[in-house]
Amino acid sequence: MATTADFRNGMCLEIEGQYYFIVEFLHVKPGKGPAFVRTKLKNVATGRILDKTWNSGVKVEEVRIERRPYQYLYQDEMGYNFMHPETFEQITIPGASIDGVQFLKDGDMVEAMVHATSETVLTCELPPHVKLRVTYTEPGLKGDTATNTLKPATVETGAEVRVPLFIQEGELIEVDTRDGSYIGRVKE
C-alpha cells in the first residue's frame, strides 16, 4: 500500500481492478480546507486518460512492475509483437497502450512493463529519442531563413513530423517520441 505522499510519475496503481500509470500529479494545499492531490492517470488497457482527485494521505494499492528489454518484430491484427533478446520469448501488446507507437520501426528496443507477480505485460515504453530517415518533404526555399518556419515531413515509419525548412528527403533526423517534435539532424 502507498499513500498520496508516495505518488510519482510512472507509478502504477490498481483502482477498481484496473491498472493505471500516473502521468501527472500535483499536491494542492488550499488556504482553507484539507490538502488534496490532483492526478492524471492513464488506463493501461485502453490508453484513456482519467483525471482523479485524492484526499491527502489516502492509501492506494501500488502495483509492482519490472522493466524488461524487448525488441520490436512486427505488427498484426492482435497488436505489436516483441521478442526478449535473451530468452526469445514473444509478447503482443495492443497499440492503444503504447505511447509514440507511430515512431516504432523494426528492430527497435523498448522497455516492457511486466506485472511482478502475475507476469502479465502491461505496456511498453519507447526510448525518448529515435533516429528516423525523412522519406518525403517539400523542398525548402533558398534564403527563407528569416523565421523559424516548420514544414511537414514524412519519416520512414509513416509518421508526420514538423521539421525546419532546410531538412531534405533522405536525411536522418532525431525525433522526441513523447511529443513527436523534431530535435535535430543526425550526422551519418
Swiss-Prot record:
One of its GO terms (cellular component) is cytoplasm. It comes from the Bacteria. PROSITE patterns: EFP. It is found in: Cytoplasm. Transmembrane segments: none annotated. Its main location: cytoplasm. InterPro entries: Elong-fact-P_C, NA-bd_OB-fold, Rib_uL2_dom2, Transl_elong_fac_P/YeiP, Transl_elong_KOW-like, Transl_elong_P/YeiP_cen, Transl_elong_P/YeiP_CS, Transl_elongation_fac_P. The keyword Hydrolase does not apply. One of its GO terms (molecular function) is translation elongation factor activity. The keyword Ribonucleoprotein does not apply. Pfam families: EFP (PF01132), EFP_N (PF08207), Elong-fact-P_C (PF09285). Pathway: Protein biosynthesis; polypeptide chain elongation. Keywords: Cytoplasm, Elongation factor, Protein biosynthesis. Gene3D superfamilies: 2.30.30.30, Nucleic acid-binding proteins. One of its GO terms (biological process) is peptide biosynthetic process. PANTHER family: ELONGATION FACTOR P, ELONGATION FACTOR P (EF-P) FAMILY PROTEIN. Belongs to the elongation factor P family. Involved in peptide bond synthesis. Stimulates efficient translation and peptide-bond synthesis on native or reconstituted 70S ribosomes in vitro. Probably functions indirectly by altering the affinity of the ribosome for aminoacyl-tRNA, thus increasing their reactivity as acceptors for peptidyl transferase. This is Elongation factor P 1.
